[in-house]
Structures are given as structure tokens and as C-alpha cells.
């Protein structure tokens, strides 16, 4: 069954059809995902919720073009991912998808400014535009005053704000956040979700974030509940 969460002519930013993902575990195969079909509309703040080991990260890796399904099809931003070669897929991912991780994944020897700027350096953006975008994103996440500080000088919440700015600085169509509040206290985690939500509305960027905390469901436009690798409770808030 395909879950179509919104009606309308706009193509979804993500479309999965009968997706399965198996991993080898010695002589046997372990099913991480089983028969997942879903559609996520554009300009949507979506959540994947489920316990640890339910398949959330595996699903994000498929949507993020980091891994390929064992069965089924994955379309992202209107493109069939299976049609890309390795180099084209890497370029597609760099242009269209931003990533936010629970452990922040910041470069420790770079300042907050340099961490946010780094993706723009990789694509060869002109210095003036690079500086404009970097400063604008740091301001958007409330870290203009901390631009020259390194990660070890920042709190956990500030590090995640840097990671959010870095994910958005290339103006991607889709941002994926894997347990973005897992290493934060409750109040800081709530502020990070609220920040992502505000930026999503302002920039009209699609967000998909995973969490094991069902209390965060109220922040999402749409939720998918995953258990034992299967989509068990799609819903619209």
C-alpha cells in the first residue's frame, strides 16, 4: 500500500515503492526494511518515529541516496535514484540534499563560520556569495556572534545549530535529520525542533527527521511510525 499524504498536482519530494533493504549477517540476511511505500509532499515537515533498531536510519539513508534498496524504487526530488551512476548520484546528493546528524559531525579544527562555509567551498562558489550565504545562515540560527568559535567552545545546542546552518547553506530541496535531538537535554532539543520548523516554513524546504520520542509528533505536519522495518502507522496531523 502506498501512503499518499497530500492531494494535488505537485510531485512529492520523496516517493518510495515497495522498498526493502536486507543486510548480510554471516550466513543469513537480516531485513532492515520490508515493503515500505510512501510519498512525502514538498514543503513539508515530516517525522519518522520508532524505537531504536526499527529501521529509521536505514530509511533515511535510502532517501538520502547514501544506500540503495535491495528491492523497490526510490525517487527523490523527482529523480529515480537507480538511474544515476556513482558520480552523478554524488553530485545529485550534494546539490539537493542536506544532512543533520545526532553527533553534529562538525570539523573540530574549523570555526562555526568555516564549518558552515565548507559545503560551498566544495562546489566552488564565488567568495562574495559564499560569505553572504554563510553569514546569513549563521544569523538565521542565532549564532552570528559565535561565528569564529570552534566546536569545543560551543554548547551541544549551539553545535546542532551550526549543523543546521551547514545543511541549509546550499539551499537544498530536502533536509534529512537523523535523531537531531538525541544528544541534547529536553529543553534544548525542543528549541532545535522549533528552529528547524521555523526555517522550514521560511525557506519552504522539505524536512524529514527521525526520532524515538513520540512526544515530538506534535511538531510535525506528517508522521510515519516504523516498527520492525515496516511502516505501521502513517498519519496526518
Model segments located where?
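ABC-family P-loop ATPase nucleotide-binding domain
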Residues: 1-22, 233-237
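ABC family nucleotide-binding domain
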Residues: 11-226
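H-loop (His-switch) and adjacent beta-strand-loop-beta switch element
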Residues: 223-235
